[in-house]
């Protein structure tokens, strides 16, 4: 079959009009990518910010204060979810929590005036609708929203398939994939493998979309961006190393399975909280095993070999790290929780330093800063963390020659174009030679340079597919990050908000390090571009990260990571 297909393509390639068509495709790909990205961005970024009201607090003056999250910090401070301007109420007084089954609890978080439920003082108590909650001597009653209010609230909320239908966007992506497959088959030798890989990719995305529709989920924009970036990644592998396509298909299928498993886990907050400690412990044990039994490649001991399979544990640990950092509001108010997270982060970064994996250590550290700020809001603590890490960084550069060499060539690659700056100088030349629209699939030169499909993948895409498409790859990650920024304030739980922000931070920092490292604006750290760089461990991880972003998506019927009601209802 492979020989027949190759013979047909050889005959077709002799046709003059087909060569012209092949050249014209270079201008079509950026246009299709732009249409896909604009449609996804419009759906993800233009929705109305619609807070959900879950209950009311009836005050002593008869006013009704909305309770708009599952976890609500109550106090006199302006940063509280429910602000009560009474002198006897502390700045941070209590946490009012809703659970999956509709029950409520109230917890004292070290207030001066105390918390009472129906006249009895308590540190934590179950609260039912109609119960009186006394905060610093001021009484409030928990009141449910009416069925009519619930119906109106559901009716006015944005549906992700309103103005921009995800099926149409997916059709544009499928057209992009078919045309990319055709061009790759015309420009590369492994035609059968290329056709099979793109066929599997298209099948997986439509099967996932069909599964969503069966489950009454209409939001598919985040997943469409992931499939778009994965398509570009498949195109890179087809051109550079077609033998790796089978591995990438398996990794993609595994990543989607992990994504769905994490979505199922996160849709039940109590289940996610129970798994948190086990997953966190697994992450640190996995890195410790990597330190002891890891295999060194390209100067970093960040690989493990299990028979014929090699993988990077640090990629899997990113998901474990998010589980460790995410926490409910009630636990965030305790010092013990903060201390444990700082110790966990230090242990992770320490293991990465021992493995010489400083690129991944940077990702974890920046994610730690974002997570720590969301947990505490304390800039002084962050400043101390940055200062301490800066001192540790100086020691690392002093005693780790490998890391020092990476920094020594930074901003001096053209002076070392034949030695330590070889890869980056060739990458920048290939970006320039590709121009805006690229040389065409399989016609680039960068594939002959080491790590061109991983560390230098931005330049690889720019050379063969054009700088416009390479920039749109970066824009796709930016759209995901912007969506998280808009979604997090509306998150039902701080667990979901912190998880989504941490996942987006990892994706953004990886993208920045990969792109800026390629063009010598930052040191080349060997960090992959999310979804695009060749690597099964990386692809598995980034699909897992998407689950945390989907868990913070509270648009109407948008996310598989958010429970729907009974079959007879249409809203969440």
Residue spans for each PLM region:
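Hydrophobic alpha-helical transmembrane segments of multi-pass inner membrane proteins, especially
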Residues: 191-420, 459-520, 544-548, 563-572
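Transmembrane alpha-helices of multi-pass inner-membrane enzymes
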Residues: 120, 125, 522-563
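Long extracytoplasmic/lumenal interhelical loops at the membrane interface
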Residues: 435-468
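Intrinsically disordered, low-complexity acidic Ser/Thr-rich regulatory segments
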Residues: 1-86, 100, 147-156
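C-terminal boundary/linker segments immediately following FHA domains
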Residues: 11-15, 116-161
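Short, highly charged, low-complexity non-transmembrane loops/tails of multi-pass membrane proteins
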Residues: 54-60, 559-572
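N-terminal membrane topogenic signal
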Residues: 157-172, 218
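Forkhead-associated
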Residues: 66-139
């Amino acid at each position: 079959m492979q020989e027949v297909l190759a013979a047909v393509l050889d005959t077709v390639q002799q046709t003059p009009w087909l060569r012209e068509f092949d050249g014209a495709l270079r201008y079509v790909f950026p246009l299709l990518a732009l249409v896909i990205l604009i449609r996804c961005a419009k759906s993800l970024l233009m929705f109305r910010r619609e807070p959900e009201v879950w209950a009311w607090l009836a005050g002593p003056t008869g006013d009704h204060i909305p309770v708009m999250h599952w976890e609500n910090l109550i106090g006199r401070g302006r940063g509280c979810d429910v602000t009560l301007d009474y002198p006897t109420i502390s700045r941070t007084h209590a946490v009012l929590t809703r659970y999956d089954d509709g029950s409520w609890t109230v917890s004292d978080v070290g207030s001066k005036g105390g918390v009472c439920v129906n006249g009895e003082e308590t540190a934590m108590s179950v609260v039912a609708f109609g119960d009186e909650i006394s905060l610093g001597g001021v009484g409030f009653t928990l009141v449910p929203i009416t069925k009519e209010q619930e119906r109106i609230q559901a009716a006015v909320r944005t549906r992700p398939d309103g103005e921009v239908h995800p099926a149409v966007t997916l059709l544009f992506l499928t057209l992009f994939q078919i045309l990319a497959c055709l061009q790759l088959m015309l420009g590369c030798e492994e035609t059968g493998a290329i056709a099979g890989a793109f066929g599997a990719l298209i099948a997986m995305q439509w099967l996932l979309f069909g599964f969503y529709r069966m489950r009454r989920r209409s939001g598919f924009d985040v997943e469409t961006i992931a499939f778009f970036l994965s398509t570009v990644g498949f195109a890179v592998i087809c051109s550079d190393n077609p033998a790796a396509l089978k591995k990438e298909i398996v990794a993609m299928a595994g990543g989607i399975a992990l994504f769905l498993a994490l979505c199922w886990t996160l849709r039940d907050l109590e289940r996610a909280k129970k798994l948190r400690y086990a997953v966190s412990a697994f992450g640190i044990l996995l890195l410790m095993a990597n330190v002891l039994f890891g295999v060194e490649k390209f100067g970093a001991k960040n690989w493990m070999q299990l028979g014929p399979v090699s993988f990077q544990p640090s990629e899997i640990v990113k998901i474990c790290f998010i589980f460790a950092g995410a926490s409910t509001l009630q636990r965030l108010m305790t010092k013990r929780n903060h201390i444990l997270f700082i110790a966990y982060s230090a242990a992770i970064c320490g293991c990465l330093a021992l493995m010489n994996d400083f690129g991944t250590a940077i990702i974890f550290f920046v994610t730690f800063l974002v997570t720590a700020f969301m947990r505490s809001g304390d800039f002084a603590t962050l400043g101390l963390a940055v200062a301490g890490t800066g001192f540790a960084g100086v020691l690392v550069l002093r005693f780790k020659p490998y890391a020092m060499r990476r920094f020594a060539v930074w901003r001096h690659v053209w002076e070392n174009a034949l030695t330590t700056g070889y890869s980056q100088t060739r990458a920048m030349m290939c970006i320039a030679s590709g121009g805006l629209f690229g040389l065409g699939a399989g016609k680039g030169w960068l594939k002959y340079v080491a790590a061109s499909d991983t560390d230098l993948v931005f330049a690889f895409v720019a050379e063969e597919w054009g700088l416009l498409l390479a920039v749109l790859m970066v824009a796709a990650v930016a759209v995901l990050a912007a969506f998280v920024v808009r979604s997090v304030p509306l998150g039902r739980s701080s667990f979901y908000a912190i998880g989504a922000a941490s996942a987006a931070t990892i994706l953004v920092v990886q993208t920045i390090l990969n792109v800026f490292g390629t063009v010598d604006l930052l040191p080349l750290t060997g960090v992959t571009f999310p979804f695009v760089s060749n690597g099964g461990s990386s692809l598995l991880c980034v699909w897992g990260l998407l689950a945390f972003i989907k868990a913070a998506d509270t648009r109407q019927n948008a996310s598989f990571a958010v429970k729907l009601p009974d079959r007879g209802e249409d809203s969440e």
